[in-house]
Amino acid sequence: MSNFLKPNTLHVDSLSPRHRSLSSGLSSGLSSACSSGSVSPVPIIPIIAISRIRDGDESESESEIELEPARIFHRRMSINNSGNNKRSTNLASIIKEGYLLKHTWSFQRWRRRYFRLKRNHLYYAKDAKCDVFDEIDLSELCYFECSIKNVNHSFQIITPTRSVVLCADSRRDMEDWLGSLKAATAPQRPRGDSILIDQHDILSNHHHWYATSHARPTYCNVCRDALSGVTSHGLSCEVCKCKVHKRCAAKAIANCKWTTLATVGKDIIEQPDGSIIMPHQWMEGNLPVSSICAVCKKTCGSVLRLQDWRCLWCRDTVHVACRPQMAIACPIGPAKLSVVPPTSVHSISTDDAWDVASPKGNFSPLLVFVNSKSGDNQGVKFLRRFKQLLNPAQVFDLISTGPSLGLRLFRHFEMFRILVCSGDGSVGWVLSEIDRFNMHKQCQVAVMPLGTGNDLARVLGWGSSCDDDTHLPQILERYESASTKMLDRWSIMVFEKAISVPKIPKMSITTEQEAVLTGMVTAANQHLRLIVETNDTQTLISSTRNLCDTIDDLVSRIFEHHKDDEQLAVKCDILKQKLTMLLDALQEEEIGAHSGDDLIATIRSLIARSVPSTNSARPSLLNPNISIEKTEKDHINLKERRSSRSLRSSEKEALQCRANSVKRAIYNVVEHSEPGRPKRYQRKLSITPFEALKIPTNSGESTPCSSPLPIIPPINIISPTMETSRLTCISPLPDTRRDSVDENFFNSINLPAPRQFADSRRSSGVPEVIQELEEGANGETIYRIGRLSLSGGANIDDAGNRLSPVSDGGDNSPIDRKLDFLRVPIITSDSIVDPLSDYRPIEVFERTYYMARELDKDKDKERKQDVVLDGEKEEDAGVNEKCEEQTLHPQNTLVHTCNLQVPGIVVTPQSQNVYTSDSITIIDTDQQSNTLQEQSSSEELGCDASDVLSAISNEECSVASEIFDKAETGHTLGDIIQNLDASNFTHIDSPETSDETEAMPGESLMDDISSVLGHDITNALQDNTITDDTTTLCSEHMGPPKPPRKKSMSALSKSQIHPRRRNSSPPRMARLARMDSDDNPQQFGFENIVFEIDNRCDDQKMREPPRYCSLAQFVEGNDIARQSFKQLMLECNSNNNSNNNSNSNSNNNNHNDGNSNDEPETPTNTVITLAHSQLTTTSTSDELDELSTQTAIKIEIHDADSSTMCTTTATTKPLESAMASSTSPTKRSGLGQDISVVVRPPTPLRGDSIKPTPSSSSILSSSLLGVRSLNSSEIRRHSSHAPSLAVREYDKDKDRRHSGFNPNYLALDPEHARFLSSSPAASRRISCGSLFKKNQKYYTKRTYGLFRVRFFVVAEPDIRLATLALIRPLIPLPNEALPNLQTLKGSKSSLFMGSTLFGFEHFSDKEERQGKDKERTPPEETSRKMPIINPIVRLPNWPNLANGTGFISKCLLANADTLCAAVSPLMDPDETLLAGYHEKCVMNNYFGIGIDAKISLDFHNKREEHPEKCRSRARNYMWYGVLGSKQLLQKTCKNLEQRVQLECDGQRIPLPELQGIVILNIPSFMGGTNFWGSSTKKDDIFLPPSFDDRVLEVVAVFGSVQMAASRLINLQHHRIAQCQSVQINILGDEEIPIQVDGEAWLQPPGMIRILHKNRVQMLCRNRSLEVSLKSWQEKQRQHSISIQRDASSTASEHAVSTDDVISERECYVLLNFIEAVSSLVKWVKFLIISHPALQHDLYEVACRASEALESIHPQGKLLEGPSLRTKLVEVIDSSRQLYDDACTLLRDRGHSLILREDLETKLSAALANMEMELKKCSVQKCIDGKLRAYFNVLAPNEESDGRRKSRPFWVRLRSGSTAGQQQFKPPMTNTREAANNWSVNEVVTWLETMQLSEYVDSFLKNDIRGKELLTLGRRDLKDLGVVKVGHVKRILQAIKDLSEN
């Protein structure tokens, strides 16, 4: 038998071409014979037997027993005898392969077979190693989904010769195979894109079969025979319901439901005007039960044969005989509003979107996405049902095509709706794709609940489930009447320690161009890494050569496809330029240029070589007088430093910066080349994400300053990789990146750091030439060039000697350049080469190019300004010389120098605003003068040289920081730029903490502080005082401390002849004296100087204190250890110097004496008084009186170590007396020590959000910021912390400080900037008022806590706010100490105008804020500020509280705002950037971490492992219950509070013992649980939850029992807060489960930030509108029934009478018509007779109408019979002409007519009656061709004419009030402009024309004019007495028509 079978096994590959064609021809011939069904069964029987003997499982079965006569010609393919090359070719052409179950004939079994799919062929064998495969020809393929023996993933393949049933492991696999079969049989196209395949499937018009059974006899639409079997089993098209046999499926023609105009084909009907009519699409037979013919209204359809027709669109059924009488146009059906007619979709344009022509009438297309897996695979039913109701091209399966195809096709629709039929996860998928296509404004999204949870559908009102598809048309009507609401969407930003490389999808289709670009980018990255890391010369040379070749090839390939893109050409040029810079740097390094020369020389040589040598060299961008010289001392210092290892590191850093710059340029070029598909490009480049190159160093070489400024890549491509070390504390402010040296943690991970925590050494790569900018007296900018020491910052000349203060005017004085304020020039024409031009980013060149032409103009003005400035400096020199004698301790030290151009810093010879005594220093930074020349530099600076600093902060900077081995010794007073936030209570590594300080006992002080303030307040103190250590950068050799510098208080009384400008730099004497100081912040390295400069290029930076970097001691579970804090030793002289104010000083001395005599051992009081006055004698006495009587603050600071009292006052007598009478010595016993006030300034706002206030009062009210206890009790009098305080008149658009942009910070994208500007800052504000009253002067005295800080307030409201600003961040005040802030919003010159401390809405005008407020916050939120924190959260026994009815609970609720606002600030959104973060996903519903996410993750894993167990919603709920009970026992998320940290709007929330945290955007969680509690009850603390208020609700989860109980009862004790941003820090090494909208995963340690992303329009169910529409439709139906009844009665009357007899009703209307015509004819004739000047044509028309009227009642009797209707036509025509001519005459000549009053009244009434009667008449053309007149008998009868005659008609024709000036208009003027000018009478006439005269009295009584008419609403009409729904709708519709027209 085996020998007999061998000839039947055809080895196709071994046959010759001739035999191969013969075999195929034989097979095709027999195939055609088989398809005809006429093959005799005689030869088949032995063949079947042979087949069974040959292979027992080769006989397939079907539901119908059908024989396969072509079985003998089954082809088999051998794959081994063709050679390896042939086999590789065959494998390459495989589309899909894998194992499937094949249904066999014997015993209905399933056998596992290996299948291979190629083009038009399918092969299968037992396994992949078989040599021979069976072949199935797919040339005429029919495939469909089926279900056999309860197998839900089976599908059947039918060809003319084979019928095979296959089964996949899952539905996804089945759909993959079906999609592959579709691709294998689709015609080949030049672009093998999946989009084209999907589009072809839409446009092909093919049927989509599935196997089904039928309860009624059903007939095949191909062969017209009945389907076999009792159940009529066969195939049905899921779209058009075409029925066929399985054997006939391949023969069915492609006439499925139309999708586009092309598929309509020859059935297109075009009207004469060119418009296309939608025709009917008929399907024959198989009509539903009880179908009624649309023409004859009789039953149609049959169960005996295939007959009658059914339209696929309007679903009308019709008989074969009645079909010609059917209307041509198809009404489309009940879902007409949602359907996209195929006649409107003309084609698919080049951007893969439909070219759409909107149809006439109402049109709101609906795009439907269905998840076929949702709802126990119920989505398949809804998918088919939607395709039957709508255009099949509107419905997409999310599993097969995803949302992108549908959104792309609908892109050209101006407005459309989206219906997502799935769960919450699929809704998020669709919304993410909407984000990607940026279609938020085009679409409105609705949800149909088919998933398990369906939380979003619940909230939107669509219910919790939808399982029945039979009522889908009614459901669509609900979605058509839905209302729109905005849904907030939140970005889940994640910063992880290790981010894995994303996997490439299995079925990803990549183009050749993308693959080539990816390979080139990868190769370039490898070459760059080798260049930076290698030490081998040959490797370096080869890598460099390969890099150049790769970049050249990359640029050429990209540029040839984008030849016209100018921006791409610029980016390519930048890439080539940066590559040239890298090569130059390599060349200099290799030839040894660094061996004996400084890096500046290298830069100079590089630039000199790159700049073309021309006569006019390129001008300098900074200064034309820069000179780079070397001295012998410089060379000595160079040789000393060359021996250190840091120099090599610096060279490596320079090279690394160059390499990173090239790498960034490559990514910019490639990103720009593919703007259309950014997501695909990101996926392709994900294998080589942008990552800054790092220099490999060992542990010995890793110094704190060894890394340059980090390059922060774009968020969308960053992929940092870090080691997984223990994460014990995470800095909450991801502002910049820092490199730290902690062995356990910070060496292995780079984390974002806040600005106050940021490492100053990050700015080590700084250009060494920095320019000083100073302002002239009249608003000009002056450039100064000074030599600054790299060690201490002193001024040094070229020879290395320090400059004296009087050297400004000498030969060594810097050359001053003045710049016009408006022009801000940067570039000069001098032939000086800028040494930093190549190191400055291209953006700086672009930004300053157009500023370069005006530098050398106005030379005379510059010289005059120099003379004025020099005179000023000479007068200041004397004071500086005196200071120098007292404080300067020069030392001959070798100092490396270079030219430094410091932007925004002016080094002046004298600081006249610094006043020093033995124990206190007062610094006045806001001295004002009456002279016109005085202006603040922070307010006049037109260009703050941010361009220079942008170069510093850019990766282009490669100059390393210089750190000296020798340190200066000495201890003097700190320079004036001091830390405002620091106090005696400072960090152990802070620069303020010198070696003289004594360490506090670790437990005593901190325990006391923690016990009083709590953990969070202690954290606030830590955050306010932590600075970063720079002592590690210094030498270990320290000199002996020196006593502090002294300055006489007599400086207070000295007059200032010339005003001094406020500077951002300390006075020169302070710098020189500070150089030898031990606590000098500048001695720790040049990088700290530049870091200070870098952070102070604008006004905000000038006000902010310097932050030097250090490492604190950390302990697990806390931010910082207690050992990291010390107590500064205050040094106060026992002698009190005399003050200018004798009375105040004497009073204070009395207190001091009392303290020192009575209690020598008790702490003394340090009384500091600040007043809003100038501490000079230049101010007039009037000004002093005015200032001193308004405001003052007195603060007592107790210090245990100080032995005397230090006092400074500047107030007048009324204030002094008040202070003296209220101040008394405070006695205290014990050993405790008082801590001085640590001032936390308010968070600054962006400058452009504050309106400048030129008011003079701003000068007075903005001069106080804070008080600080310095090393010598230094007090700074400062204007403000906010950039815009006391802003004077200037053009703020020309000052970049007020644009909110700072080039030195990391890039702040516009979207994030808008978020920061719209959301309240995370300031410590008080949201509710208290007991202070407006404008009430009184005096308060309070002592709070352990600090014993006393605040004396004698002031107006502004100074009370100032007091609160000082104490607000530290002390939780009771309500009585807080003023009523809502009453203080009137003062625009308030001290806190630019601050967000109290949320005063920035004191801007209401008109400017109105639009933003409406978009940003709802009205309820105006009185409450975020975050709103539950006051019970900080109770130690939370959540184990009572019912909340006790006294403590009531007190907590009463002081909720005060307690909530006192939480320690940890994160300020205004200062936070997202560098290092990437968007993990987007949250729409809720976010969970802990137990809830663990349950969701376990359920997800269970569903993946056993999908058959999770196919129904009931089973899924059961599994959730089981898994929740499991967590009740296991408690895997126990002690979650130890593993995570929670921050709400920057405020740390103390967490109790809990197992999870849930963040809600909607009030529904995990299947309907209301975790937040009842939202209907009014809450005194929280806002009602809503999904459109941009507010999140944070809830604690204590266990699975609480989760279960929340489904039944409303729990509220677990509420944490309401806020606008959330940050969660995950500590430790373990991953924590996290879920977003039900999708769970394990999140590694790191930081998670939840920020507002955008808003999307969602459709919510509107039940009230549904009820109204339903009632209206019912009335319309009743009305149509009555009309039909009347029409039938009229028809019966017509049938009874052979002639058209006038009915009784029509006769009544006819008599009224005759009366109206007669009256009009009469009064028109009288008008013409009375005014002979008028035209006589009107009289002829009146006579003609009168004659026609007489013809219908000759001799006083009406005509009878059909002649009456014919005669009436003439009467109607003549009367209408008379009416029109009369109105035209009155309109044209009315202004000159003077009519009698009675004639005017009667004529107007006649015209009005005629108009109403003409509306009741109609003329119709009958079958015989004659015209006949008919009357509308259903129109309501009018009231008597008396009322109408009392109101003249043509009042509505006039626009004026006087008759002589009236201008007539048409009777019915429907334009909005005309209606707006209507009078009451015209409105009444308008009502009468609508036959609503019963409301005339009401409109007259309420004086409703046209303007009021256009604004009437439903409620207004109800008040006017219009209660009938029909009348209300008619009036509203008419008003709408008036408005639209």
Curated annotation (Swiss-Prot):
Alphabetical list of InterPro entries matching this protein: ATP-NAD_kinase_N, C1-like_sf, DGK, DGKD_4H, Diacylglycerol_kin_accessory, Diacylglycerol_kinase_cat_dom, NAD/diacylglycerol_kinase_sf, PE/DAG-bd
Positions of the SAM domain: 1878-1941
Family annotation (Pfam families): C1_1 (PF00130), DAGK_acc (PF00609), DAGK_cat (PF00781), DGKD_4H (PF22944), PH (PF00169), SAM_1 (PF00536)
GO BP terms, alphabetized: glycerolipid metabolic process; phospholipase C-activating G protein-coupled receptor signaling pathway
Chain residue ranges for the region called Disordered: 1030-1068, 1132-1164, 1215-1257, 1276-1295
Entries under SUPFAM superfamilies matching the protein: Cysteine-rich domain, NAD kinase/diacylglycerol kinase-like, PH domain-like, SAM/Pointed domain
Residues annotated as domain PH: 93-186
Keywords noted in UniProt: ATP-binding, Cytoplasm, Kinase, Metal-binding, Nucleotide-binding, Phosphoprotein, Repeat, Transferase, Zinc, Zinc-finger
SMART domains hit by this protein: C1 (SM00109), DAGKa (SM00045), DAGKc (SM00046), PH (SM00233), SAM (SM00454)
Top EC class for this record: transferase
Cellular component GO terms, alphabetical: cytoplasm; plasma membrane
Family: Belongs to the eukaryotic diacylglycerol kinase family.
UniProt function note: Phosphorylates diacylglycerol (DAG) to generate phosphatidic acid (PA).
Name this protein carries in UniProt: Diacylglycerol kinase eta
